[in-house]
């Protein structure tokens, strides 16, 4: 870590006022404050003086989301493997199937690792696209407005994928988060000034712009051509008695739905 600290200190003059890379200072500052404690401290008549800064608060929220994220990956793989096993399908002809084969994993719903890895192959691309597309927009606005890149996007960038179905097209993932960052956050001035939730605004945009990929019965299980309604969908269409899941399943989270919405237990652990 000392080597990184020395490197950042050496680069600081180039990004400071008058330096060759002055316009890119927000990008430098984002890396510096992500790795180390921000150099600025509260001054003046602040209401609270505390060791907790925005970075620590946001990192705390990210840590709280870890149980839900892990459950999202496991349950996504479990629901898919459950269907594949019931239909006698042993291979999947896409890059995820090739990755599973390369790791020597079968599509077995009784295998924890198989479920987790297969689910991760759906969740991680969504997360990576979210962080890349949203991060670029954040960087552009910070550079133009000459203000720091806040850690709040780390939270939005994790919440957003958790609200999506596993089958969502990646280009829609990018489009949704770009819309959310711009119109739910940056137009109001950025972190601390926006009254809309970036993750939910992004999802709402996709819901109204591309309803076929984010609603209905065909998007909740990551198996081509398979349909399965959510509990809310079944209750609305046929009544509560039509829900096939037990209360224990609903509490634990091994039911269909958006990747991060199914487990009450995981949410409570994070809370």
Segments the model singles out, each with a brief description of its role:
Residues 52, 121-124, 139-149, 165-168, ...:
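Short, amphipathic, aromatic/basic-enriched membrane-interface segments that mark the entry/exit
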Residues 58, 62, 124-128, 151-155, ...:
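Hydrophobic alpha-helical transmembrane segments
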Residues 189-268:
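Long hydrophobic alpha-helical segments that form multi-pass transmembrane helix bundles
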Residues 150-220:
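A generic, well-ordered mixed alpha/beta core segment in the N-terminal half of proteins
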Residues 43-48, 133-146, 182-192, 269-271:
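C-terminal ends of transmembrane helices
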Residues 116-130, 167-176, 236, 255-264:
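Structural signature of hydrophobic alpha-helical transmembrane segments
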Residues 1-123, 127:
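N-terminal signal-anchor module of multipass membrane proteins
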Residues 61-75, 131-138, 162, 178-182, ...:
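Hydrophobic core segments of alpha-helical transmembrane domains in multi-pass membrane transport
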């Amino acid at each position: 870590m000392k080597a990184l600290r020395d490197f950042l200190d050496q680069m600081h003059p180039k990004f400071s006022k008058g330096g060759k890379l002055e316009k890119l200072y927000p990008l430098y500052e984002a890396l510096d404050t992500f790795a180390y404690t921000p150099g600025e401290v509260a001054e003046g008549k602040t209401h609270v003086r505390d060791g907790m800064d925005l970075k620590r608060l946001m990192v705390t929220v990210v840590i709280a989301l870890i149980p839900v994220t892990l459950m999202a990956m496991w349950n996504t793989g479990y629901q898919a493997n459950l269907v594949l096993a019931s239909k006698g399908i042993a291979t999947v002809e896409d890059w995820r199937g090739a990755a599973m084969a390369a790791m020597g994993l079968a599509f077995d719903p009784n295998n924890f690792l198989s479920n987790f890895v297969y689910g991760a192959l759906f969740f991680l691309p969504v997360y990576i696209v979210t962080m890349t597309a949203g991060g670029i927009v954040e960087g552009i606005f910070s550079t133009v407005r000459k203000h720091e890149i806040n850690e709040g996007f780390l939270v939005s960038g994790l919440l957003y994928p958790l609200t999506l179905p596993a089958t969502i097209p990646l280009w829609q993932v990018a489009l949704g988060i770009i819309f959310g960052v711009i119109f739910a956050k940056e137009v109001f001035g950025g972190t601390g000034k926006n009254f809309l939730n970036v993750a939910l605004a992004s999802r709402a945009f996709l819901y109204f712009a591309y309803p076929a990929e984010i609603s209905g019965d065909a998007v909740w299980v990551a198996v081509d051509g398979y349909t399965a309604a959510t509990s809310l969908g079944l209750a609305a269409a046929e009544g509560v008695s039509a829900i096939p899941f037990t209360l224990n399943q609903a509490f634990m989270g091994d039911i269909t739905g958006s990747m991060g919405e199914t487990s009450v237990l995981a949410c409570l652990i994070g809370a």
